């Protein structure tokens, strides 16, 4: 007991002193009264309760931290998904605008090239070729009137016989001038209807075909 008294630890109760592993009687005391013992137990309970409270506070704090961490991560992911969806939508719009622009450019380039090639041909020969192709569509008709540009009408009349001989089914073939038509213009009138075989009309049909093809390609890529 004397060794215990010499350690110099601070007292918690008048009859005990703190030892790392247990409680011991204070110096000079040999008898532990019941009320003092009960007081000691109460103190130990308070210390234990305080430790438990501290541990619970730490646990709660850790739980709150994890919750906030998870909420922050989820909020970040939600924001990233929203940004991703926005970027995808903007990219799709840009692609559509690009396709439309390229479609227009390609159509213009092709048509310009076709017109340039056609301009290198003799206009009368080209008109006769157009008439030939148009007559092939109405070769089962007996009477056909061919309307052409007034500047070409005389020359076409002189040479139409070379074309007519390839279509003996057509018994009557007349060439007439039409001021509404440009060089290369050609309209065929028959008993069943009218056919516009003009060069400009064929180029316009080519333009529509190019636009349709490019549009179908764009739809296929989007799917």
From Swiss-Prot:
Pfam (any one): FliH
Chief location: cytoplasm
Single GO BP term: protein secretion by the type III secretion system
Keyword Transport annotated: yes
Gene Ontology CC entries for this record: cytosol
Induction: At 37 degrees Celsius in the absence of calcium.
Cellular localization per UniProt: Cytoplasm
UniProt note: phenotype after gene disruption: Deletion mutant does not support type III secretion.
Presence of the UniProt keyword Nucleotide-binding in the record: no
InterPro entries per the UniProt record, alphabetical: Flagellar_FliH/T3SS_HrpE (IPR018035), T3SS_SctL/SctL2 (IPR012842), T3SS_Stator/FliH (IPR051472)
Keywords noted in UniProt: Cytoplasm, Plasmid, Protein transport, Transport, Virulence
Complexes and interactors: The core secretion machinery of the T3SS is composed of approximately 20 different proteins, including cytoplasmic components, a base, an export apparatus and a needle. This subunit is part of the cytosolic complex. Interacts directly with YscN/SctN (T3SS ATPase) and YscQ/SctQ (the major sorting platform component). Forms homodimers.
Assigned protein family: Belongs to the SctL stator family.
Role, per record: Component of the type III secretion system (T3SS), also called injectisome, which is used to inject bacterial effector proteins into eukaryotic host cells. Acts as a regulator of the YscN/SctN ATPase activity. Overexpression of YscL/SctL abolishes type III secretion and down-regulates the expression of secretion apparatus components.
NCBIfam families for this protein: HrpE_YscL_not (TIGR02499), PRK06937.1 (NF005392)
Protein name stated in the entry: Type 3 secretion system stator protein
Organism (species): Yersinia enterocolitica
Lineage: Bacteria, Pseudomonadati, Pseudomonadota, Gammaproteobacteria, Enterobacterales
Gene designation: sctL
């Amino acid at each position: 007991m004397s060794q215990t008294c010499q350690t110099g630890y601070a007292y918690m109760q008048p009859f005990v002193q703190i030892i790392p592993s247990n409680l011991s009687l204070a110096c000079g005391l040999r008898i532990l009264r019941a009320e003092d013992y009960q007081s000691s137990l109460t103190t130990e309970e308070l210390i234990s309760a305080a430790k438990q409270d501290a541990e619970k506070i730490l646990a709660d704090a850790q739980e709150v931290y994890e919750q906030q961490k998870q909420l922050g991560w989820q909020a970040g992911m939600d924001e990233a998904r929203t940004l991703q969806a926005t970027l995808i939508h903007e990219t799709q719009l840009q692609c559509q605008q690009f396709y439309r622009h390229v479609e227009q450019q390609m159509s213009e380039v092709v048509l310009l090239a076709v017109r340039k090639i056609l301009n290198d041909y003799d206009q009368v020969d080209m008109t006769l070729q157009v008439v030939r192709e148009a007559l092939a569509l109405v070769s089962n008709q007996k009477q056909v009137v061919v309307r052409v540009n007034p500047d070409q009408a005389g020359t076409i009349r002189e040479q139409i016989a070379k074309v007519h001989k390839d279509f003996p089914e057509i018994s009557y073939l007349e060439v007439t001038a039409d001021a509404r038509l440009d060089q290369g213009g050609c309209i065929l009138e028959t008993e069943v209807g009218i056919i516009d075989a003009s060069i400009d009309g064929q180029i316009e049909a080519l333009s529509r075909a190019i636009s349709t093809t490019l549009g179908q390609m764009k739809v296929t890529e989007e799917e």
